[in-house]
Amino acid sequence: MIWQEKIDAALDARRVADALRRRYPVAQGAGRWLVADDCQYLNFSSNDYLGLSHHPQIIRAWQQGADQFGVGSGGSGHVSGYSVAHQVLEEELAEWLGYSRALLFISGFAANQAVIAAMMAKEDRIVADRLSHASLLEAASLSPSPLRRFAHNDVTHLARLLASPCPGQQLVVTEGVFSMDGDSAPLEEIQQVTQQHDGWLMVDDAHGTGVIGEQGRGSCWLQKVKPELLVVTFGKGFGVSGAAVLCSNTVADYLLQFARHLIYSTSMPPAQAQALRASLAVIRSDEGDARREKLAALITRFRAGVQDLPFTLADSWSAIQPLIVGDNSRALQLAEKLRQQGCWVTAIRPPTVPAGTARLRLTLTAAHEMQDIDRLLEVLHGNG
């Protein structure tokens, strides 16, 4: 098979399965409204959970940072790309979440890949929740360490896997809030079992940080758990982009030596770090509390209104509210119907989710109003 035949066959297989991914250029897509092709939609696909992407204080901080530092960092943090703006942000993140150190990364995907690649060797073992994010599972599969997956949130299965002999170290990997189901991991139980087997715990809290817990400190803080490795990202609750790894001093020093994604990537712009500091200030403030309370009320309203729909409703009280349809083509049809009625919703299909669980991944944000939720419910019930 020549290259073109290989590529064509892969694309044809996706088309036949109604699993071909497409991008849609939008004029505005992060806030309450999405604008595409000169049409305006209520946006139920954004991860901007607190509605901070258009916050004037954060925008102003980015603009002032660009005036001070320029629009780029100019290099890796190991060369000339680590500014005082990066340093102060790392210190503020560490203090906020109760860790000795924080290290900034350009994305959550990069952070997860970097940590697992740097930490694991062939004599070690990775034990990951089966529904962990693609960045975690891909990093684990590329690692020299064997990968074992435990059934979703099944602590008994996790304990059984950890109990089998391992010549090296064991790293347990999970998410705080799962990106496709919106449910939460039982972190206290997972940490207890992990410690019983002398393992370390790595939690990706991309969808919890900023959104839940006291001052938005996330899933681990809420469940009174402190994993050895905590990954937080800034494209969801923070309304910006980027990520950080929270850890001990020695682990941070180790990652600075061996995390290749950190060493060989250009750092995020200092202006972005300034914007993230402003976002963190909002998240920790009374305004942040008010936004989280509003989001919780919207979630309650939505869940009360979808109980009688002919879809499987996930066990989620997070901003992620998937309606599991099952069939790929049915999910696509429903998403298109919603768009025709002015609600922008994304159909998520395999391989992003397991076969037979295609869904509408609805996300609610603090930028929404109660009437937006009521409109969505009206359309879902066929009364649009």
Swiss-Prot record:
Its cofactor is pyridoxal 5'-phosphate. The keyword Cytoplasm does not apply. Belongs to the class-II pyridoxal-phosphate-dependent aminotransferase family. BioF subfamily. Homodimer. It catalyses: 6-carboxyhexanoyl-[ACP] + L-alanine + H(+) = (8S)-8-amino-7-oxononanoate + holo-[ACP] + CO2. The keyword Repeat does not apply. It is an enzyme of class 2 (transferase). GO terms for molecular function: 8-amino-7-oxononanoate synthase activity; pyridoxal phosphate binding. Substrate binds at R21, H133, T352. Catalyzes the decarboxylative condensation of pimeloyl-[acyl-carrier protein] and L-alanine to produce 8-amino-7-oxononanoate (AON), [acyl-carrier protein], and carbon dioxide. This is 8-amino-7-oxononanoate synthase. Keywords: Biotin biosynthesis, Pyridoxal phosphate, Transferase. It comes from Escherichia coli O6:H1 (strain CFT073 / ATCC 700928 / UPEC). Pyridoxal 5'-phosphate binds at G108, F109, S179, H207, T233. PROSITE patterns: AA_TRANSFER_CLASS_2. Pathway: Cofactor biosynthesis; biotin biosynthesis. Its EC number is 2.3.1.47.
